[in-house]
């Protein structure tokens, strides 16, 4: 079972085809965008796994990878995704635009399209896809857009969704918006779900959403993992 599979091993490093989920994401960005610096944030339990991955990766690909151990070991003590982002920004004094993503999602299209979209719009951006199942809508972030892809509403796990566009954990943040994380946390922004900051930010400043041109596979359990492996082995 994937719980057992990932109890002592991080999901982003599970193999899909000939390489890990994280390799698929990182290699795509290096090959198709001008992104050349990566930061992996991990809990203490898995930090060494990512350090080992980094050592092997840097033997074959010449780009900068930093692994940050957030020092937490349990669900009860974890910082939450938004505070993890804040930790990285403060620790590394980051003052650039950021692409933030969860490492356990596989895409069948290039993220370069999303990066180009964000540059063109010159706002912080999210990705979205149609989700027509109510139960799934209630477990994710749901947005509505106008005809220029501007976000008009953004709700985390809504009981009564206003639309059917779901937001997966991929975000392009402008540097000026990244500076507002502390302000967000002080003003009611949730810190656990990765999309909480984007939801808060969308009410403060214009944000756009890129409608995904392909599929995203979330590795949630053993069935979804086996399915993704079968898709990528074709």
State each model region's role.
Residues 1, 15, 19-100:
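Conserved N-terminal catalytic core of the sugar/cofactor nucleotidyltransferase
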Residues 7-12:
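Short alpha-helical oligomerization interface
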Residues 49, 83-87, 113, 196-197, ...:
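Alpha-helical elements of Rossmann-like donor-binding domains used by nucleotide-donor carbohydrate transfer enzymes
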Residues 105-108, 216:
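A short, conserved beta-strand element in the Rossmann-like catalytic core
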Residues 109-138:
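Conserved donor-nucleotide/metal-binding helix-loop-beta segment in metal-dependent transferases, i.e.
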Residues 115-119, 150-218, 222-234:
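Catalytic-core segments of class I nucleotidyltransferases/pyrophosphorylases
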Residues 144-150:
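Short acidic-glycine loop/turn motifs at beta-strand connectors
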């Amino acid at each position: 079972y994937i719980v057992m599979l990932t109890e002592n091993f991080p999901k982003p490093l599970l193999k899909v085809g000939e390489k890990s989920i994280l390799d698929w994401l990182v290699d795509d960005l290096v090959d198709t965008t001008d992104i050349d610096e990566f930061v992996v944030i991990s809990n203490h339990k898995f930090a060494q796994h990512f350090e080992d991955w980094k050592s092997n990766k840097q033997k074959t690909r010449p780009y900068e990878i930093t692994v940050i151990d957030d020092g937490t070991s349990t669900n009860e003590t974890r910082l939450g995704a938004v505070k993890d982002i804040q930790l990285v920004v403060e620790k590394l004094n980051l003052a650039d635009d950021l692409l933030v993503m969860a490492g356990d999602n596989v895409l069948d299209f290039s993220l370069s399209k999303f990066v180009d979209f964000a540059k063109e719009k010159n706002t912080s951006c999210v990705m979205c896809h149609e989700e027509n199942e109510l139960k799934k809508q209630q477990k994710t972030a749901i947005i509505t857009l106008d005809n220029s892809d501007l976000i008009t509403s953004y709700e985390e796990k809504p009981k009564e969704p206003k639309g059917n566009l779901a937001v997966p954990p991929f975000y392009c943040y402008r540097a000026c918006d990244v500076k507002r994380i502390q302000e967000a946390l002080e003003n009611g922004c949730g810190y656990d779900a990765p999309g909480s900051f984007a939801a808060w930010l969308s009410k403060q400043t214009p944000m756009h959403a890129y409608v995904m041109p392909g599929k995203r596979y979330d590795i949630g359990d053993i069935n979804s993992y086996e399915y993704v492996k079968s898709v990528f082995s074709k």
